[in-house]
Design a protein with these regions (language model features):
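Membrane-interface segments of envelope glycosyltransferases acting on lipid-linked substrates or membrane lipids
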Residues: 1-112
Length: 112
């Protein structure tokens, strides 16, 4: 199974810590091929690299960040994942539609 994860969290809270543990655990499973995209964060990148994951860092900026959605789409098209798992609202909103299952893990509480 090919899984792409995109984490747009800025800080390092509970969801971000779980994401790092999950990505590092997936890295040890032979039946999972994964690609990891993260918001620019040297600490998170170092923790992932320590687990054998080589993350791709993107800006995941605000509403005027037009580069990240294009770059994310390009990486998805190159990798051709079965599943895209997005973490946090920003990554979810920047994820294009495609021929994959999209699973969104949103953080915090939202007034829907």
């Amino acid at each position: 199974m090919k899984i792409m994860q995109a984490m747009a969290g800025a800080g390092f809270g509970g969801a971000e810590a779980f994401f790092v543990r999950l990505a590092n655990a997936f890295q040890r499973v032979n039946s999972i091929e994964q690609k990891v995209i993260i918001r620019e964060n040297p600490n998170r990148a170092a923790l992932l690299r320590a687990g054998g994951v080589e993350p791709i860092e993107m800006k995941f900026g605000g509403r005027f960040d037009f580069a990240t959605p294009r770059a994310l789409k390009r990486e998805i098209n190159k990798f051709n994942p079965d599943v895209v798992l997005t973490w946090m609202n920003r990554a979810t909103l920047m994820c294009p539609k495609g021929d994959f299952v999209h699973v969104a893990r949103l953080g915090g509480y939202y007034d829907l």
